[in-house]
Amino acid sequence: MGRAVKVLQLFKTLHRTRQQVFKNDARALEAARIKINEEFKNNKSETSSKKIEELMKIGSDVELLLRTSVIQGIHTDHNTLKLVPRKDLLVENVPYCDAPTQKQ
């Protein structure tokens, strides 16, 4: 797959993730859209393979971070915030056991 195709694929993936993560939040959606477009536009003329790979790594890390770490909060009252987790954020709740397992 060509480098231009990979860059375009990352660009589209970042925008899809932005739409999922900031759903129903017009201000955050717009700010993220502007930032993504700005970063890609600023590095549009980059020709160094090493620098392009580095930027691609940063972009994919940002996408992963957005998808797995950001949670939406909605103000319901004066001092109340309702959290709206996505399925990507929900993990199986396994109890932690610090004691070593005993051999039988």
Swiss-Prot record:
Post-translational modification Phosphoserine, affected residues: S60
This protein's UniProt keywords: Chaperone, Disease variant, Mitochondrion, Phosphoprotein, Primary mitochondrial disease
Signal peptide positions (record): none
Superkingdom, natural source: Eukaryota
Compartment(s) where it occurs, according to its Swiss-Prot or TrEMBL record: Mitochondrion matrix
Result, substituting D25N: In MC3DN8; results in impaired incorporation of the Rieske Fe-S protein into the CIII complex
Annotated Pfam families: Complex1_LYR
GO biological process, one term: mitochondrial respiratory chain complex III assembly
InterPro entries xrefs: Complex1_LYR_dom, Complex1_LYR_LYRM7, MZM1/LYRM7
Family of this protein: Belongs to the complex I LYR family.
Reported disease: Mitochondrial complex III deficiency, nuclear type 8: A form of mitochondrial complex III deficiency, a disorder of the mitochondrial respiratory chain resulting in a highly variable phenotype depending on which tissues are affected. Clinical features include mitochondrial encephalopathy, psychomotor retardation, ataxia, severe failure to thrive, liver dysfunction, renal tubulopathy, muscle weakness and exercise intolerance.
Known function: Assembly factor required for Rieske Fe-S protein UQCRFS1 incorporation into the cytochrome b-c1 (CIII) complex. Functions as a chaperone, binding to this subunit within the mitochondrial matrix and stabilizing it prior to its translocation and insertion into the late CIII dimeric intermediate within the mitochondrial inner membrane.
Name by which UniProt lists this protein: Complex III assembly factor LYRM7
Organism: Homo sapiens (Human)
Organism classification: Eukaryota, Metazoa, Chordata, Craniata, Vertebrata
